[in-house]
Amino acid sequence: MQLTPREVEKLMVYTLADVALKRKQRGVKLNYPEAVSIITVTAMEGARDGKTVEEVMNEARSVLTRDDVMDGVVELIPNVQVEAIFTDGSRLVTVHDPIQ
């Protein structure tokens, strides 16, 4: 199978998000890459599901709380930018203050 660099990157993000969600379910506090991957995948899947940009931003902002992440992670992630594919094309989505 031949994958483009972008496809490889997406695959890595999805794989990390899968591991991170399993850790979250077990009550393990998430680190920076795990938190970013969950927020990113939530935004990408929301766009794929046909949601609006505003709906995607709100959903991605509500997927994690301070209790889900290690100390200091919230301050490391002031925003997350994701290029998501919506039904009408690709858009850059910025999720401000993604961990509440």
UniProtKB/Swiss-Prot annotation:
Keywords: Cytoplasm, Hydrolase
Major location (coarse): cytoplasm
Subcellular localization, as worded in the UniProt entry: Cytoplasm
Cellular component per GO, a single term: cytoplasm
Any one Pfam family match given in the protein's UniProt record, by short name: Urease_gamma
GO molecular function, one term: nickel cation binding
Pathway in which the depicted protein is active: Nitrogen metabolism; urea degradation; CO(2) and NH(3) from urea (urease route): step 1/1
Catalytic reaction equation(s): urea + 2 H2O + H(+) = hydrogencarbonate + 2 NH4(+)
Protein name: Urease subunit gamma
Taxonomic lineage of the native organism: Bacteria, Pseudomonadati, Pseudomonadota, Gammaproteobacteria, Enterobacterales
Gene that encodes it: ureA
